[in-house]
Each structure stands twice: as structure tokens, then as C-alpha cells.
């Protein structure tokens, strides 16, 4: 019988049952979905990189590496694979299309293996596979090396390196080297690489490899600190290995030119002008680095927002079950009078609530962990390669959300039943005595109370007399309002983010990184050729010392960009120093530093505080903070040349150039021209950084939309549930009012007037809570690359 009455109860109160189920499902789905998004994204990229044997070290040398070098590297400690390859930038023409620069590489065998998207791999020298993100080149197209592919300043043209000048596209691929949309810059064409091409190694004609990739036999989790420490140790070891290899190669070249063994035996790399080698880790791969930052942003939202979301859902569920048991007093009393034990009676209501919890939790988890990661991953397709999301299952999370769902429903039901069952059957079968009348606060203010009409006085009394109902409505509505405001606030904080950073704060057009340090001397012969190009191509330029230092303060260490302007009075050409209120900040004087807001907030720094910055050789500079400027991207410490020289005993080494372009100038054409100079190591165009940040923010917009829609759905279900409870528990009161002759609209107004008052209260409280919740959530979205403003637009309060 009890089983039958339980199912009958579910059938008769299916609206309430469905509401509980929906709240649980929405809360669990949102919480679990966002929580599982980063693990799923990480698992997908990790599996892709593992299948492709993504490199651990990338070795470069101006002399290249031979097969003997590669064989030697393969025998070193912990090495699983060492593989040489060819890569160069090539200007192609494509059947009447505009010429474009494509990174052309040899198909790898063991490291950075390609993932075939469509077609097949090259089988002949004149076949190639292309970047799957390049929609303009199709399978079957023929791409041909352009005649004017050699850029000024290059020692040899691609005509000499590539044996084959025309390739037929036979497939499209994804490469572990290019997991996001960035393809890099070049000295050719318009200065931008449009995509990549892989051809057979036999298509190259070179006696040495341009690149060597090394894969170690140790496995670590993606982005793990243990991996970073391991690679740092390996890099130190490989310094001597590469130095020996490059020196031997240099001596072989000299001997091939006629020098004897005795003549070259004492030569060192310091004697070799223009000979350099580089040992690069994954941190130089833009896609790899950006993915960590992007996934951290997702995790920042998922860290706190879903917790508040599920708390609101849990609270409403607990209230609903508590009110339901109170409504069922007569039924509980009757069952008790019929001889049913406490366990049997409790079981009926616990099965009711438990069924709603289990079904809602299961449905919410399955739908949430599918929909939320899928939607967010789809958004990231704008920035990253297309691949199916590979999901993971976190059984700890499954057990946790199920336990929380049961606790807030079954647990509440148990406590409520236990309280009701403590009374006698006769007492339970009688309706609960109404609460004694009390004067409410407004009755003590005659000026207001006397002016209220009778029905409004009744509504005011009811609002404040039934405190459970009051707090239930206030907490439920304010919680949903706070969640909605937070969602809109996140959108306000990220919209216009890139335009603000690269339009109002960083106003320079680009940065050149020099091959050789120029100690503040513009007349240095190493700088003279680049200076001519700069004076022709730019409207202004300034030498800058920009390097990575560690800020050491209060037991913490943070990597920062140390910037020293050669001519500090020119800083406003490239950077606008202003605090959060917009007040201008002066460039720091001797013994002073200006830092960005994110650093100041992280270490609780104020103007006048003393900080220490330390370089890689453990040399330190102590400075007083003279200003804190608004900045969103990266962390900066600005000091004066005098400060550096005073504390380090030498002039700064200026290895960067900030520049601005003339109005309407093509930044990428000028970038290509500047890259053609021997003194230039790289050119960064701020417009490209702006586009990269904008794409990151566009992806985050999808998360915001999901958050707002979910919060809106929760608000709807909560309001439905609370209104349903409010009306159901007042059936007798409504009947009495109708008997007294109230019209239908007056009866409705009597009930809903209270709802409107409580809803207004709840919204007001929710807007205040939303400000704090938004600030808290934004504070949790912390990544090394970006920092967001805590800003809510006025219209968001209206929405």
C-alpha cells in the first residue's frame, strides 16, 4: 500500500515533483558541466599531442644539424626519439589566387606526427598535404613556388633548397605544432604566414637539417609543474651537448674551406661570428601556451560560479521538501493512526524526494557533462583545430553531486518527517493552529500605516508574519538575480577588453626584438642598417630594454616583464600610464618603479611599498613603488635607466625597439621589411596581439551565454516552485476570501501582491549580492596572461 500511495503522490503532485527534479537537474548539470569542461578539453588536446608525439625540445642552429648529430642526440639520456627535419617559409602562387607564404616542412616520422583530416599522405616528391584550417586550398589544387620568393637579407633562396617547385595537394592535416589559429610571421610577402604545407623529405635538397626535435621517454600530465622542472633540468644538460655539436660542425666547415686541424682545434664559438644555437621548449609554441591560458579562464569561471548556482538549487529543494512534509501533516497523522511505523511513513516521503533527486541528478549530470563542454569546445573551434571532444568521467564528482542531491532532498525530508512524527496522530490530523497575530514594524509608524488600504495592510502583515515564506522567497529570488547579474557582468568585463588594452593602454604599433644588444648607442654599426629602415618605415621608434625578471615579495615569486625606456619622456608614445580612476601616472624616477594593477592586487602592494626584482643570475634591484597603472595583458615593472645603472653598475642592454607607424601604413608589409634586416630577431605587431585576445574573448562569450541562459532557467524554475508552494499552502485562505465575496481579480491580486513585494525585495537584495558575486568570480578568473576589470554596465542591472 505504501508503495502505491507513494506513486499516487508523485502522480497527483507531478508539477512539484518535476520542479524538484528540474532544479536538481539544472543545478547538477550546470555544476558538473562546467567542472568537467577543462578536464575534457585538456584530455582532448593531451591525447592529440600524445598520439602525435609532441616534442619536448626543439633544437635550432644557424649552421644546421647533420645525420651524425641526430644519431648522437638519440643516444643521450632519457631520449626516446631524436628526429631531424626541414622547414622554411615559401611564397607560393595558387592557380590565380593571391600569393601567400606557407611554412613548408618535411613530413615527420616519429615526432610531431600529422593527423590526417581528409585525403591521403604524400607518396611522391611533388605531392603535399596542407593545413586543414586553410579553406582556400583544396585537395587536387596545385601550388607553385613563386619566382620572387627570396626575401632581402637571406643567404640562399628556396629555389636552391627545394628540389620540387610545384606540388599537388593530396590531403589536409592537423599538426601538433599548430593547435591554434596562429601561424607566425615571416620576412616574405605581407609578413604573415597563411598556413603550413608538409612535403616529402626527398623534396628538399640540403646537406643538413634546419630543425631537430627531441622526445624524452618520460611521461607527465599536460602543463604539470613536474614537467616544467624536468625540462628545465634537461635544458641545462643539453646546453653543453648542443654547444659541442655546433662547434664540431663549425670546425668541419672551416676545414672544408682549407683550414687544417691544428688551426681549428683552439677555436671556440665566441670566435664564430654569426654562429648561434637555440634550445627551445614547448613554452615557445604559441598554440601550446595559449591553450593553457584559455583553459584556465574556463576553469576560473567553473571554480566558483557553479558552486553558487547549485547552492541556490539545493536551498530551494530543501525548502520545497520541508514545506511538502508540513502540508502532508494530515496524511502522516492518518497513516500513524492506521498503525504504520515511523520508518514506513518516512520511507514514503524519502522515496518521493529520493526518486526526484536520483532522476534529476542522473539526467542533469549526463546532459550537463555533454552539453556544456560541447558548447564551449565548439566556441574554441574558432581558435583551435577541429577535433571531437574526448570526454572523461570523474567518479568523485559523480558521487559528490549524487550525495549532495540526496542530502538536500532525502536529508531534509528525514528531518522534517522526524519532527512531525514526534506529535501524536490526533494532533497531526488536525490543521496546524494559525500563527498568533503580531504587529508588524510598519504598524508602529502611523504616518504610513494609516494611509494603507485594508487589502494592502493584510498583504504587509502576511509578508512579515510568515518568516519562512519570506526568507524562502527572498533567498531564492535574490540568489537567481545575483547569478543573472554576474553572468551579464562577466560579459561587461570582457567586452571591449582587447580594444581597451590595445587602444587606450598600449598605444604603440609594434615591437622589434634585436639579435644583438645595443647598449643605448643608436650609432652602433650593428644598429645602423635597421635604423635606416625604421626611419623610412615608422613615424617614431625608441630603444627599450625588455626582459623577464622575478618579482620577489612577501615570500612569493612572480615572473614579470622588466621594461626600461632609453628615453623615458617618450613612454606615452607607446604606453599610457593611468590608474583605475584615469589619473595620469609619471614615469618612475631613480630608485622607483611603476607596476600594473594585477601585480599590486596579488601582493597587496601600495604606493611607497618596496619591492625586489631579480634576474636569472640572481642579481637584485630594490625599488619603491611610485605608481600603479591599469593594464590587462601581462605583468610589467617599469624602471628608469638611472635606477638600473645605479644598482647593477652598468648601462641597460637595449634589445628591443618600440615603434609606431604612419597613419594607414600596412603593418605586415612593414613587419616583413623589418624582419629582413640582419639585426632583427622578431617583429611583433600589436594589432595581431589584439586579434588574438579578441578571439579568446569571443570564445569566452559562449561561456557567458551558457551561464546567463542557465541562470535564467534556474530563476524560472525557482519562481514556479516557490509560487506553487505559496499558493498550495494557502488553499483554505484563498477559499475564505472567495466566500467573503472577493472577485476573481481581487483574489488573484491578494495572493500575487505578496509575491510582487517579495520578488521586489529579492531582486533588490540580489542586485547587491550580484555585485559582490561578480567581483568574486572575476577575481577567480586569474591567468598569467590577462586580468579583467570588475565592471558591470548600468543596463545589466535592468536586464
Model-derived regions: residue spans:
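Short cytosolic juxtamembrane segments of multi-pass membrane proteins
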Residues: 421-440
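Interfacial "coupling" helices/loops that link adjacent transmembrane helices in transporter permeases
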Residues: 5-15, 315-355, 701, 705, ...
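C-terminal transmembrane helical bundles of large multi-pass transporters
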Residues: 655-657, 671-779, 783, 787-790
